[in-house]
Amino acid sequence: MNKIPKKDIFRLLGELEGDVGLFIADEATGEIFTVNGDKLFVACSLIKVPILAMLLKSAEAGEINLKEKISIPIDKMVGGTGIIYNLSPGIKFSWEDMMVLMITLSDNNATNAIIDRLGIDKINSFFAEAGLSHTTLKRKMLDIDAIAEGRNNYTTASDMGNLLFSMAKGEFINSSISESVLNVMRKQIYTCKLPAAIPAVPSYATLEEKRSPMPGKVSVANKTGELPMTQHDIGVFQLASGRKYVIAMLTANLKSDYDGTNAIVHVSKIVYDAFCS
């Protein structure tokens, strides 16, 4: 039986002033529902998820030691989201630490260090090989010069949704990497969008509680992205029954950031209610 509440979603999206891309998938039935799935959006921090997958793939191949520690020079620091630029200069982090910071706190400096290590060209080749045909990395995080030149990072709801759907099934690269990416995403601190109006397992819960939620709870592995008048969130949801579904919702050219955030919150809520009915 189809669970995705399409009519309610169309009604809600019709009230949103701005652009939207939406992907919803039900792992149990294979049903996929999209709205403007191939519409390009500035990726914001969503692009950090496939970058994490590539880092883990490189580590599995023996090309990177995740335990190796590095420090980020002060002259390479950028602002925006994250914590590293507020810490003592010269502090060292392992690549393992960097990847957690990149996702859970959306740390731009951790992300840029990982991009430098992997290489932009190789990252884009990985995206193409992984089937992310509309996802491109043209600059590092908060690269003001690149932005002034018109270079930006792009993706679509379908690229991000299919990526997470593949991971939810344990099929992205392999089951180990799929689960490792989701385990990092389950530690997410930013939960004001997709998880906000549903009984999500809290971010401070143990990993086991997040992987096997109690009755009445839902585990969420999500990653947000935002710029002024642009609000995104993507996530894998797991009910206590074990049933999984995916939502990737991207918005831009909004009347207000609140409108985008509120729309994401409400889409997530009506999808959750439908899957629990």
What does each of the following model-derived ranges do?
Residues 61-87:
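Short, glycine/proline-biased beta-turn/loop segments that scaffold the active-site neighborhood
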Residues 37-41, 85-88:
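Short glycine-enriched, charge-decorated loop/helix-capping segments at active-site entrances
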Residues 52-56, 112, 161:
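Short, hydrophobic alpha-helix immediately C-terminal to the catalytic nucleophile
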Residues 5-20, 25, 87-89, 96-99, ...:
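Penicillin-recognizing serine hydrolase domain
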Residues 18-40:
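Short, conserved catalytic-motif segment at the N-terminal edge
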Residues 98-106:
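Short helix- or helix-capping micro-motifs
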Residues 30, 42-70, 102, 247:
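Active-site SXXK
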